Amino acid sequence: MRCLPVFVILLLLIASVPSDAVQLKTKDDMPLPSFNGNARRTPRMLSNKRICCYPNVWCCD
């Protein structure tokens, strides 16, 4: 029974350490400014479409 908490703690420590493959994959994935620009642009596009489509249903594509 004494080994169980030690075993669980070791499993948690091993699971929390990122591997090299994960770090290399996410380093060059997407530049942060581009991601932030897309995050701001998407709600703006949705709000523009909502304004257009609310009074005129025919303008929705």
Swiss-Prot record:
Propeptide stretches are 22-48
Q: How is it modified after translation?
A: Contains 2 disulfide bonds that can be either 'C1-C3, C2-C4' or 'C1-C4, C2-C3', since these disulfide connectivities have been observed for conotoxins with cysteine framework V (for examples, see AC P0DQQ7 and AC P81755).
Which cellular component, as a GO term, is one annotated location? extracellular region
Principal localization reads secreted
For this UniProt record, the keywords arranged alphabetically read as follows: Bromination, Cleavage on pair of basic residues, Disulfide bond, Secreted, Signal, Toxin
Q: Where in the cell is it found?
A: Secreted
Q: Where is the signal peptide?
A: 1-21
Q: In which tissues is it expressed?
A: Expressed by the venom duct.
Instruction: State the domain notes.
Output: The cysteine framework is V (CC-CC).
> Into which family does the record put it?
Belongs to the conotoxin T superfamily.
What protein name does the entry list? Conotoxin 3
Q: Which organism is it from?
A: Conus textile (Cloth-of-gold cone)
